[in-house]
């Protein structure tokens, strides 16, 4: 059995196994743990009462967190004409069509979000094998294929998160950075859960939000007492 590092031992001493934590208590405790050598994110995992093997129970959406994620988001937009001007005015880092596709084929993929207007999908369709595995392929279900590219850019820059249930029916997403105020972090999580409830599949039975776990990038996951959340 591998020995625990000094950091892991310090963390283990502060965590109470089997406990469900009040949200603010969990956020404060995680922020107080020995830090990694970079600014960690707060991440949340939500176990949902769905069967992701059934297509009508795959939960997938996007929502703008009220306080963002603390991350600088680079956005590329496939569009042309007046929409291209609107995307640039909204803060897009790169806007184009065939020339942008050529750049991406050449390996320039330093973007966090890729957005496309419907008329640009003839170009974007060539990039499926490049963008798909990286989770960057535009999709109307999460608002990244839209005629209103300017609003999509603003949402991405404002801290919109995209999520989809994994094979175990769990969604994972970042909800802030270590320096976030606990109240703002809580409001971000509440907004996420409210959005999950909004798109609950009609065929989902029983308890829908089964468990909420808060963690930091390199830290442990703490189960949250859902009664401490207003969602």
UniProtKB/Swiss-Prot annotation:
Keyword Flavoprotein on entry: no
A GO CC term attached to the entry: cytosolic large ribosomal subunit
Keywords (A to Z) from UniProt: Repressor, Ribonucleoprotein, Ribosomal protein, RNA-binding, rRNA-binding, Translation regulation, tRNA-binding
InterPro entries xref list: Ribosom_uL1_bac-type, Ribosomal_uL1, Ribosomal_uL1-like, Ribosomal_uL1/biogenesis, Ribosomal_uL1_3-a/b-sand, Ribosomal_uL1_CS
Top-level taxon of the source organism: Bacteria
GO terms under biological process: regulation of translation; translation
Assembly description: Part of the 50S ribosomal subunit.
Family (UniProt): Belongs to the universal ribosomal protein uL1 family.
NCBIfam families: rplA_bact (TIGR01169)
Name recorded for this polypeptide: Large ribosomal subunit protein uL1
Organism encoding this protein: Pseudomonas fluorescens (strain Pf0-1)
């Amino acid at each position: 059995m591998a020995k625990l590092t000094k950091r892991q031992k310090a963390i283990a001493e502060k965590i109470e196994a089997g406990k469900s934590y009040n949200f603010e208590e969990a956020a404060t405790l995680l922020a107080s743990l020995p830090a990694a050598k970079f600014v960690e994110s707060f991440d949340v995992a939500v176990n949902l009462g769905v069967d992701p093997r059934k297509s009508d129970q795959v939960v997938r959406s996007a929502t703008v967190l009220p306080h963002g994620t603390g991350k600088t988001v680079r956005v590329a937009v496939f569009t042309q004409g007046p929409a291209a001007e609107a995307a640039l005015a909204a803060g897009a880092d790169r806007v184009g069509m065939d020339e942008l596709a050529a750049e991406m084929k050449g390996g320039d993929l330093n973007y966090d979000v890729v957005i496309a207007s419907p008329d640009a999908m003839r170009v974007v369709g060539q990039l499926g094998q490049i963008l798909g595995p990286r989770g960057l392929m535009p999709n109307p279900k999460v608002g990244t294929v839209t005629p209103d590219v300017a609003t999509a850019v603003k949402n991405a820059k404002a801290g919109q998160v995209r999520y989809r249930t994994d094979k175990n029916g769990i969604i994972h997403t970042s909800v802030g950075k270590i320096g976030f105020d606990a109240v703002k972090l809580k409001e971000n999580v509440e907004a996420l859960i409210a959005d999950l409830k909004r798109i609950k599949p009609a065929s989902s039975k029983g308890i829908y939000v089964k468990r909420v776990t808060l963690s930091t990038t390199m830290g442990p996951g703490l189960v949250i007492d859902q009664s401490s959340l207003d969602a």
